Design a protein with these regions (language model features):
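Acidic, metal-coordinating catalytic segment for phosphate/diphosphate chemistry
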Residues: 1-25
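A generic structural micro-feature
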Residues: 16-20, 48, 95-101
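Active-site-adjacent beta-strand/loop module that shapes the phosphate/pyrophosphate-binding cleft
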Residues: 30, 82, 90-114, 144
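Conserved Nudix-box catalytic region and its N-terminal flanking loop in Nudix hydrolases
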Residues: 33-75
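Nudix hydrolase/Nudix homology domain
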Residues: 44, 49-52, 113-152
Length: 152
């Protein structure tokens, strides 16, 4: 067995340096507008407009990414997907950090989102108004994902 293979032990409930984070991100749209969620708390550096995020969360042990995406939409925006397109499985190991594996979805919502748990506000903007960063996602990546999904 090679030293660098991705073989892990049983799941744990705490963050562990050098481990693996499997997450789902839902880039949310409704009637052509981008839906952003103001969620105070976790704030990465470089955001222009405050605590703006797309719904995201870690996958639970054994949870399918599609099910996680639907769960996250209900938690953040009390909403359901009209359409859901997986546009990328993003894998990166930032220097000195853990492995990040993210399932990136473009989601068209059935109805407008409502504030879920710990959501301060919901903003709908035109795609051309995208800030430089939304959560950990750069504007250029968001635009690329929208293009891949045919939602640009």
């Amino acid at each position: 067995m090679s030293q660098g293979q991705a073989i892990f032990g049983r799941p744990i409930t705490s963050v562990m340096s050098g481990g693996l984070y499997v997450v789902v991100n839902a880039i949310t749209l409704h009637k052509g507008k981008v839906i952003l969620f103001d969620k105070p708390g976790v704030r990465p550096g470089g955001q222009d407009l405050g605590n703006l995020w797309f719904p995201w969360d870690f996958l639970s042990y054994g949870e399918a990414p599609e099910a996680a995406c639907k769960r996250v939409l209900k938690q953040w925006g009390k909403c359901e997907p009209k359409t859901m397109n997986l546009v990328e499985v993003f894998s990166v190991v930032p220097p000195g950090e853990s492995w990040h594996l993210a399932f990136q979805y473009i989601v068209e919502l059935k109805a407008p989102a409502k504030k879920g748990a710990n959501i301060k506000d919901i903003k709908d903007i035109e795609q051309r108004q995208l800030p430089r960063m939304v959560g950990w996602l750069r504007r250029s990546d968001i635009k690329r994902y929208l293009t891949l999904a045919g939602a640009d």
